[in-house]
Amino acid sequence: MENNYTIRLEEEKDYRAVEELVRESFWNVYRPGCSEHYVIHTLRGDPAFVRELDFVMELGGRIIGQNLFMRTVIEADDGRTIPVLTMGPICIANDLKRQGYGKVLLDYSLEKAAALGLGAVLFEGNIDFYGKSGFDYASQFDIRYHDLPEGADSSFFLCKELKKGYLDGISGVYQTPQGYYVDDADVEKFDKQFPKKEKLKLPGQIF
């Protein structure tokens, strides 16, 4: 891992490069093709989008990583609505993965979110990676994932308090922001703006 990287806020001039980066990173990972590049494209105009936490990572003048945050809520069992953040997509360029850049970008992003006074981040991820940055299973905070049947595996659903004790005494249901839900036809139309890539059905895909 080289140390001459920079992390800064995304600018409009970065949009296409970021979308290309995300497309390459997620292509055929969770589904044949991917939708994450279109998700980012639409999230930028969403009211829940946090512009102060929309980051790119550069190395040698090239954008090699990105991360973003959205505002959402926990619908608490006692009737309260608890403001929280969700995160992602987050990615690093394929040729630079597993070299430490992802954790650096993640930790920087979380520090900036905490500095804004925000209380907690909840999202879907792998505990083996995100646990190294302080995430735990959301079930440990008594927070449930929306629409997940009781007793179903929720090990993908993670949480990190940015303010210690922010979720003390709270139980409830996390809501994914609507901006993450996109129509497949819209994804297909948007994807035609990019170089053609082969969609493959591969083992381990979840969609």
Tell where the protein language model's regions lie, with residue ranges.
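A short beta-loop-alpha structural element at the N-terminal edge
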Residues: 6-18
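Active-site rim helix/loop that mediates acceptor-substrate recognition in acyltransferases
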Residues: 19-22, 26-68, 73
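Internal, conserved structured core segments that host functional sites
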Residues: 52-53, 57, 88-91, 118, ...
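Conserved glycine-rich acetyl-CoA-binding loop
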Residues: 62, 80, 93-104, 116, ...
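A conserved beta-turn-beta hairpin within the catalytic core of GNAT-like acetyltransferases
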Residues: 73-86, 97
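Conserved acetyl-CoA-binding loop-helix of GNAT-fold acetyltransferases
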Residues: 87, 92, 98-111, 123
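Conserved active-site alpha-helix within GNAT-family acetyltransferase domains
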Residues: 115-118, 125-152
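Acidic/histidine-enriched, glycine/proline-rich intrinsically disordered or flexible terminal extensions
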Residues: 164-207
